[in-house]
Amino acid sequence: MTKENKLIVERPFRNPHHTASKVALIGGGKEAKPGEISLAHRGILFLDELPEFNKSSLEVLRLPLEDRQVLISRANKNCEYPANFMLIASMNPCPCGYYGSSEKECTCSSNDINRYLHKISGPLLDRIDIQVEVQSVDYSKMMNISKEESSNEIKERVNKARKIQEERYRQYNIFSNAELSPKLIEKYCQVDEDSKKLLEIAFKKLNLSSRAYNRILKVSRTIADLEGRENISKQDIAEAIQYRSLDKKYF
């Protein structure tokens, strides 16, 4: 409910500043009020300049990302708030922003880069399903967008995929692939032998955790849904693996 006591009919989008405290993010205080993660329930929590957040503030996100809820304990009461949000975060590759750039030389020392990147812990990064490194866009490519898929076309595909997932999981009272438990992953994310071999290679080469393994399967299930296919292909698995390699490259 809003301050005007009207029902919220749009998904929330929360964008807290990087100076936000642990209490501001997860909730708490004398009255055990909900924090940003609960205010973003069924919506998006966007953390811009992720390494600029206090590391201890970021670490409190780990459990809610798994449980999709948060328990706030006070001396006289315990409050449980929902926290089923989509975390979207952005960051530069280094303090100056040009590490790995082909356009401009990075001015940071190796120690500066390591300190900056390691503000994001491995366990937190392991809970982020899709990790994408984005290069700067060349002007000529930016202007040549006539053949690209439009936002409306992408939106239509996403809506179709969401409807597929809502129908598929109706009996479990969940709405998306992201909410799949390990047991449901085994049922709905089945792959062929070639895909299993590819997963095994990636698991060993990238030293993936079991959590990362399950998230690759969930992302590949989503890729297949976006393409309108019932079965997960080897290509879907390969694409999903590419979205998990960033933490092994820099962290």
Task: Give the residues covered by each predicted segment.
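Short, basic, glycine/proline-bearing loop/turn elements
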Residues: 19-23, 102-105
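Hydrophobic alpha-helix-in-membranes signature
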Residues: 11, 15, 92-94
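Conserved alpha-helical scaffold flanking the Walker A/P-loop in AAA+ ATPase domains
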Residues: 7, 12, 20-45, 78
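Conserved P-loop
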Residues: 1-10, 231
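Basic, amphipathic alpha-helical bundle interface domains used for macromolecular binding and assembly
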Residues: 31-32, 50, 55-251
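Histidine-centered active-site/metal-ligand motif
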Residues: 17, 41, 236
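A short alpha-helix capping/helix-coil boundary motif
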Residues: 1, 14, 39, 178-179, ...
